[in-house]
Amino acid sequence: MAKFTPASLPAEFLDTMRDIMPSSLSMEDFIAACQRPLRRSIRVNTLKISVDAFLQLAQPYGWQLEPIPWCQEGFWLLNAEEENTRLGNTLEHLSGLFYIQEASSMLPASALFHHNDAPGTILDVAAAPGSKTTQIAARLNNEGAIVANEYSASRVKVLHANISRCGVSNTAITHFDGRVFGAALPEYFDAILLDAPCSGEGVVRKDPAAMSHWSQESITDIAATQRDLILSAFHALKPGGVMIYSTCTLNRQENQQVCRWLQAQFPDACEFESLDDLFAGAERATTEEGFLHVFPQIYDSEGFFVARLRKTGSVPPLPRPGYKVGKFPFSPVAHKDRALLTEAARKQGIRWDEELLQLWQRDSEVWLFPAALTSAFGNIKFSRIGIKLAERFPKGFRWQHEAIVALADPNASNAYALNDRIACEWFQGKDSYPEPLPTADELILTYQNTPVGLAKRISSRIKNSLPRDLVRDGASSARPLAKE
């Protein structure tokens, strides 16, 4: 494991923390926590495997897993520094069975579903790399719909890769400045998660360089952007809907003051909802407003802030955007073709709920779009919607990797379970020569009963068809090496 270099904390930052630190906490503990390495943590992806099944699977690995109190699917991996294998290259991670996610960043999605709220259409304003989007999708069990927005072009590809790896089917990706949604989709979303860009004061344990450009001036600029984002998000939220505002920073200017500013704009339409009962021990981090202000020493985690706001009534709309979205490039698949496509997919072992996902087409491409989002088509431009199911050819369909990962039946007649050795070869982009040979010519490959791809058997060889951008030369099992 790389040597940990503690962060250098600016004196002005420490003075700010000293001024806002609750009397129940000490600066000495705060500084000590900031200068310790961050505990590794993972979240079980219940779209692929149950928590109980994952714990049983992980038993032989020697992992010491401690439950994270605010996320039933989350665990601290206490002996991560003893592991020689990088978690991200394990077969279990590449197969989407778990997501490497910092424990504190699991708080916003947990707060969104507090009191078992199950909103239908959700906006994730700043979604990359996808940890919270995939957590929300798992809580929804791929029902409803999520718009996952990312402003940074370089991070959109990573966002899609993580959504695909985790088998998420109910999500559309957009690439906008988050300030557009209030005008473009007024009062459209049942719930919104705004994990706002921030000064990053809480991440020094993971990124000691995070404080290298810290200044009060930059915080003032960032807070202005946050106010713009939360205002737009509030306009995009339905009356009665819930918004989670979160940051990975600690100062009040980017946290409490942003939330209070929004409430001051709409005193009759914005209420704060307390998170003091979100989990056992939450009161240790709860502010007088009911926000969670998580200093790193409280739970031995990253510093974090989470607020839950309720929109209690309509507000005057923003001016409609002046730009034109352009013609929507997809059209619904005709009824006759739908039946043909659905039957062909089922023969291949691919199934979906036709009430949740609908067939659309563009030229030779066939897609499955979340039904809950159809009213948004034509109002904003999407970078990607749902799942690319197939490409049409004169002699049939070429089924797409992401459709197999999300929708294939691991118990289909053409499914073939990979052992650790062949699964490593698959993710390394290599052909395999398995024994015994599979009988089918076109195979749904599975690992730990989860689909990982589609391949053809050619004589005694499984031809590797994993998309090149998913190949990992270092792919390896988390299982201790043993004879197969």
From Swiss-Prot:
Q: What does the UniProt entry say about where the protein is found?
A: Cytoplasm
What EC designation does it have? 2.1.1.178
InterPro entries (alphabetical): Methyltr_RsmF_N, MeTrfase_RsmB-F_NOP2_cat, MeTrfase_RsmB-F_NOP2_dom, Nol1_Nop2_Fmu_2, Nop2p, RCMT, rRNA_ssu_MeTfrase_F, RsmB/NOL1/NOP2-like_CS
Q: Does the keyword 4Fe-4S apply?
A: no
**GO CC annotation terms, alphabetical:** cytoplasm
GO process annotations (BP)? rRNA base methylation
Per its record, what are the GO molecular function terms? RNA binding; rRNA (cytosine-C5-)-methyltransferase activity
Give residues annotated as binding S-adenosyl-L-methionine: A126, A127, A128, P129, G130, S131, K132, E150, D177, D195
Q: Which Pfam families match?
A: Methyltr_RsmB-F, Methyltr_RsmF_N, Methyltranf_PUA, YebU_pre-PUA_dom
Q: Which reaction does it catalyse?
A: cytidine(1407) in 16S rRNA + S-adenosyl-L-methionine = 5-methylcytidine(1407) in 16S rRNA + S-adenosyl-L-homocysteine + H(+)
User: What is annotated as the active site?
Assistant: C248
Q: Which residues cross the membrane?
A: none
Coiled-coil ranges (or none): none
Instruction: List keywords of the entry alphabetically.
Output: Cytoplasm, Methyltransferase, RNA-binding, rRNA processing, S-adenosyl-L-methionine, Transferase
| Enzyme class of the recorded protein, top EC level | transferase
UniProt family annotation: Belongs to the class I-like SAM-binding methyltransferase superfamily. RsmB/NOP family.
Q: Describe its function.
A: Specifically methylates the cytosine at position 1407 (m5C1407) of 16S rRNA.
Protein name, per record: Ribosomal RNA small subunit methyltransferase F
- The protein's gene is named rsmF
